């Protein structure tokens, strides 16, 4: 009698989830040792740290986006389109919501998928902390759709400015949140203005753009060493960005932001990039333990505290560190967690002991568009933290994305993609113009 294949279901096709599905597809799916299924509500994957480039148009997502269906076929796993709305731990099934088109017509009814092992890799969304007016008036940058919306509204503002030759004053853009997204977007906006001017947007120069970056903490990039924060702050100031620290936004309306200090920051376009939380529907889903920002609480093995057959990785997981505190929500952590959880699932299948996840901080890098890149590297060679900037930092920053591509495609295909990217930079506009 044939033993039924073990069913491993991964929910969330972000960096960690997709890398894990790819590797398990190679190790188990292709060899018919297990059935691997990836579930995501989107058709394609785009590395989240690139969203600020999609927002300003310096990256065309059509080139870098990866089709889940095509990738699944090539790497030994299956893909299911849809959003998970429930987990039945007793029956070992997840429920996927029905799919409807833009007209509301039913495409796929609600369905259930059985699992033996479930991995939650749903990432995070921006946390507006229930600040009045934010949802209605600010754009979040959590997915490509939101990035495209920002891009279109940005182009419309610049087009209006160019047509009126600045008769209505400057283009005011406010960004709330001095983390990597806010800092990188602030710099990319100035690069966008420079490129649009070269493509014929009359009167559109750096002087026409007024970017305000608002951070509630004492400094921007609070998760990085102070010297990195200072270097980034200095570079942004040189570009003309107004950086406000220790400034809390209390509400937003159509025309701008209200701060706790009583200042009103006028803005034609507002972005909220302050804080993160796991998706709201995760709160106590399936009776699993969650924290105040909806993250699934996990053991050091990355298994959820109330079910050893359910793992959580990446930003949606609250994982304690032996020295105290929790694993930070960063791309390198998601990558490391994916590898650890995969190895533990394989060990679980073979009756071997599981290993605890240990976060290794390899440093952080922040790209200030074409103007500069700053960051720190950490490791055995440096015996601590070493600050890097300029071309070396830019090379390492780009290498992080290449490592993600290699994990998904291998060296040969990644090399071909780099070649195609080089060709596109020659034949395509430097900025997406529509």
Swiss-Prot record:
NAD(+) binds at residues 176-181, 275. It comes from the Bacteria. The keyword Electron transport applies. FAD binds at residues 12-16, 42, 84, 124, 315, 331. One of its GO terms (molecular function) is NADH dehydrogenase (ubiquinone) activity. Its main location: membrane. InterPro entries: FAD/NAD-bd_sf, FAD/NAD-binding_dom, NADH-Q_oxidoreductase. It is found in: Cell inner membrane. Its cofactor is FAD. Requires Mg2(+) for activity in vitro. Inhibited by 3-n-dodecylmercapto-2-hydroxy-1,4-naphthoquinone. The quinone-dependent Cu(2+) reduction is partially inhibited by superoxide dismutase. Signal peptide: none annotated. It is a peripheral membrane protein. Disulfide bonds: none annotated. It catalyses: a quinone + NADH + H(+) = a quinol + NAD(+); a ubiquinone + NADH + H(+) = a ubiquinol + NAD(+); ubiquinone-8 + NADH + H(+) = ubiquinol-8 + NAD(+); 2 Cu(2+) + NADH = 2 Cu(+) + NAD(+) + H(+). Pfam families: Pyr_redox_2 (PF07992). Binds 1 FAD per subunit. Induction: Expression is subject to a complex network of regulatory controls at the transcriptional level. Under anaerobic conditions, is repressed by the global transcriptional regulator FNR, which binds at two sites in the ndh promoter region. Transcription can be activated or repressed by the DNA-binding protein Fis (Nbp): at high concentrations, during early-exponential phase, Fis represses ndh transcription by binding to at least three sites in the ndb promoter, whereas at low concentrations Fis activates ndh expression by binding solely to the far upstream high-affinity site. GO terms for biological process: aerobic electron transport chain; aerobic respiration; anaerobic respiration; copper ion homeostasis. The keyword Membrane applies. Its EC number is 1.6.5.9, 1.16.1.-. Alternative, nonproton pumping NADH:quinone oxidoreductase that delivers electrons to the respiratory chain by oxidation of NADH and reduction of quinones. Utilizes NADH exclusively, and electron flow from NADH to ubiquinone does not generate an electrochemical gradient. Belongs to the NADH dehydrogenase family. Contains four structural/functional domains: the FAD-binding domain, the NAD(H)-binding domain, the copper-binding domain and the domain of anchorage to the membrane at the C-terminus. Monomer. Forms a supercomplex with the NADH:quinone oxidoreductase NDH-1 in the aerobic respiratory chain. This is Type II NADH:quinone oxidoreductase. It comes from Escherichia coli (strain K12).
């Amino acid at each position: 009698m044939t033993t039924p294949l073990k069913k491993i279901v991964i929910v969330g096709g972000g960096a960690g989830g997709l890398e894990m599905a790819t590797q398990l597809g190679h190790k188990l799916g292709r060899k018919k040792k297990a059935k691997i299924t990836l579930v995501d509500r989107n058709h394609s994957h785009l590395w989240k740290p690139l969203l600020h480039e999609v927002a300003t148009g310096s990256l065309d997502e059509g080139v870098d986006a990866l089709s889940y269906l095509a990738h699944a076929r090539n790497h030994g796993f299956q893909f299911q389109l849809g959003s998970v709305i429930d987990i039945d731990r007793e029956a070992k099934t997840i429920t996927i919501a029905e799919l409807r088109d833009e007209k509301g017509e039913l495409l796929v009814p609600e369905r259930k998928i059985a699992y033996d092992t479930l991995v939650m890799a749903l990432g995070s969304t921006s946390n507006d902390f229930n600040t009045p007016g934010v949802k209605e008036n600010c754009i979040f940058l959590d997915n490509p759709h939101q990035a495209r919306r920002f891009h279109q509204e940005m182009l419309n503002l610049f087009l209006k400015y160019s047509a009126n030759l600045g008769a209505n004053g400057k283009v005011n853009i406010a960004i709330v949140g001095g983390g990597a997204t806010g800092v990188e977007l602030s710099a990319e906006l100035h690069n966008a203005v420079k490129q649009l001017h070269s493509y014929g947007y009359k009167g559109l120069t750096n002087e026409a753009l007024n970017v305000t970056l608002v951070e509630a903490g004492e400094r921007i990039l609070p998760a990085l060493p102070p010297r990195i924060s200072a270097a980034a702050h200095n570079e942004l100031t040189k570009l003309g960005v107004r950086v406000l620290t220790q400034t809390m936004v209390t509400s937003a309306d159509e025309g701008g932001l209200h701060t706790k200090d009583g200042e009103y920051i006028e803005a034609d376009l507002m972005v909220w990039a302050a804080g993160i939380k796991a998706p709201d529907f995760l709160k106590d889903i399936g009776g699993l333990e969650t924290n105040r920002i909806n993250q699934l609480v996990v053991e050091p093995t990355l298994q959820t505290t109330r079910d050893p057959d359910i793992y959580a990785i990446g930003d949606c997981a609250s994982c304690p560190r032996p020295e105290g505190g929790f694993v930070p929500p960063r791309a390198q952590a998601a990558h490391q967690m994916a590898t650890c959880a995969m190895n533990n699932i394989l060990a679980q299948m073979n009756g071997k002991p599981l290993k605890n996840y240990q976060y290794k901080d390899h440093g952080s890098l922040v790209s200030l568009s074409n103007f500069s890149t700053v960051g720190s590297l950490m490791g055995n060679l440096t015996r601590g933290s070493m600050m890097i900037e300029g071309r070396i930092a830019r090379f390492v920053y780009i290498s992080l994305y290449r490592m993600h591509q290699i994990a998904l495609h291998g060296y040969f295909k990644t090399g071909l993609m780099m070649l195609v990217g080089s060709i596109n930079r020659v034949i395509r506009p430097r900025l997406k113009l529509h």
